[in-house]
Amino acid sequence: MKAIISVSPGRAALVHDRPLPSLRNGYLLVRTKAVALNPTDWKHIEITERPGILFGCDYAGVVEKIGPGISSRFQVGDRVAGFVHGGNSQEPQDGAFAEYILAKADIQILIPEHMSFEEAATLGVGVTSVGQGLYQALQLPFPGTQGEDPKTPTEEQQPLLIYGGSTASGVLGIQFAKLSGFAPLAVCSPDHFDLVETLGAVAQFDYADGEEAVQEIQDYVDRMSKPLRLAWDTVSIPSSAQFCGDALSALDECHYASLLPIKCQRSDVTSTTTMAYTVFGEDWGMGATRFPAVATDAEFGRRWWALVQELLDQGRIQTHRIIIGENGLDGVLAGLERLRDSQVRGAKLVYRV
């Protein structure tokens, strides 16, 4: 089959003779219909030294076979989507960029009838990151699956800063935070203010304005008469961490969460980094670095993805904007170069397989 794998240190290529993966306990064999690209994909390629490791994390497809240890929720022929662990140096068969892939059943969804393969392919990394960042790290209450969604901020709503509000994780985070009763404040490019407002951000701020934007945020929360205690950073670089730390209120109970190992420089702010790959509950590797399984993250992931299934079925979560790339799997490597060069913004790059 076609697949995008590591062929030498820091280099990946499309091959045409990759064997189908061997089905494991708790996994589905899926015939891939669409894949979406993430920055983590090209970053993994750059640090991978061993040949034969499959890349890609976001996919949608059709169940071909069901492995042992899986409940009756999934059937052969089901349309499914979710998160797979591409670039895993501990398990080279895992990944999305192939015609047939393995997907751990606990953290996959049945695609709702109203959603296309291309739309569903955008969910995996973002949904997992939102769950870990907002609900494990920052301890937001889970959204309810009944009742009306809040339309406008109320006096009871607490502000929540989301830096990178127009990223794939950010646009999901805004929606989930709103469903949990928070008032999302989005930091992004002005080009995407309309997008994040449509999804539920109560205010938008230009990251390029630096200290001026920080002051605008502080003025906004002052008018809310609510302190800003929580910040989620989907960009997770030194400047974004500094921005979030400056924007948080001067209180002892503030919390900053990031997607990469970086900390807020304020000593009075708790910093937490989440790594989406721990959701699989298995030992894993990133390049030459090894990480142990985290059973609590796997258990959280099962509960989280079950909730997400309900919210998607109810049409209460929108997927990110998509751009369809050319040439299917053959075009993915060129797409990753576009992503690495910051040529794709405010949308998710998706390829049909």
From Swiss-Prot:
Keyword Nucleotide-binding: yes
Subunit structure, interactors included: Monomer.
Pfam hit, one: ADH_N
Superkingdom of source: Eukaryota
Protein known as: Trans-enoyl reductase rstn7
InterPro entries recorded: ADH-like_N, GroES-like_sf, NAD(P)-bd_dom_sf, PKS_ER, Trans-enoyl_RdTase-like
The species this protein was found in: Aspergillus nomiae NRRL (strain ATCC 15546 / NRRL 13137 / CBS 260.88 / M93)
Binding site for NADP(+): Y207
Gene3D superfamilies for the chain: Medium-chain alcohol dehydrogenases, catalytic domain, NAD(P)-binding Rossmann-like Domain
The EC number(s) this enzyme carries: 1.-.-.-
Pathway: Antifungal biosynthesis
Gene behind the chain: rstn7
Alphabetized GO MF terms: nucleotide binding; oxidoreductase activity, acting on NAD(P)H
Top enzyme class: oxidoreductase
Listed CDD domains: enoyl_reductase_like
Similarity comment: Belongs to the zinc-containing alcohol dehydrogenase family.
PANTHER family in UniProt: HYPOTHETICAL OXIDOREDUCTASE (EUROFUNG) (PTHR45348), ZINC-TYPE ALCOHOL DEHYDROGENASE-LIKE PROTEIN C2E1P3.01 (PTHR45348:SF2)
Function in brief: Trans-enoyl reductase; part of the gene cluster that mediates the biosynthesis of the tetrahydropyranyl antifungal agent restricticin that acts as an inhibitor of CYP51 and blocks the ergosterol biosynthesis. The highly reducing polyketide synthase rstn3, the short chain dehydrogenase rstn4, the cyclase rstn5, the FAD-dependent monooxygenase rstn6 and the enoylreductase rstn7 are required to generate the first stable intermediate desmethylrestrictinol.
Assigned keywords, A-Z: NADP, Nucleotide-binding, Oxidoreductase
